[in-house]
Each structure stands twice: as C-alpha cells, then as structure tokens.
Amino acid sequence: MAVPKKKMSKSRRNSRKSNWKKKVLKKVLFALSLGKSFEANTNVNFSFGDKLPQ
C-alpha cells in the first residue's frame, strides 16, 4: 500500500487544496452556465463570468 514517506507541511497542503478548489469551482460555474443555456433553449451560445466568487 502506498503511503507518503514524509509529513506534508500545512502550508503546502493548504496550497494544493486551494488550487484544487479553484479548479473545481471553475468547472462548476461552467456546468451551471451550460445547464442554464440548455434550460433557456439557447444552447448555441453560453458564457460564464471570469470572476470567481469569494
């Protein structure tokens, strides 16, 4: 079974988790935008904001 050899520092862990959350949030916003466009029958054109909510 694979296990890490050394303990990962809190700052490194938090940094990686933050990057992962940003990527997930971007995908979620894209999926919601696409879903809204399909619901409104404007599935040819859709967009989502570049700004991430804080």
UniProtKB/Swiss-Prot annotation:
Its main location: plastid. Residues 1-20 are annotated as: Disordered. It is found in: Plastid, Chloroplast. The keyword Methyltransferase does not apply. Keywords: Chloroplast, Plastid, Ribonucleoprotein, Ribosomal protein. GO terms for biological process: translation. It comes from the Eukaryota. GO terms for molecular function: structural constituent of ribosome. GO terms for cellular component: chloroplast; large ribosomal subunit. The keyword Plastid applies. Belongs to the bacterial ribosomal protein bL32 family. This is Large ribosomal subunit protein bL32c. The lineage of its organism: Eukaryota, Discoba, Euglenozoa, Euglenida, Spirocuta.
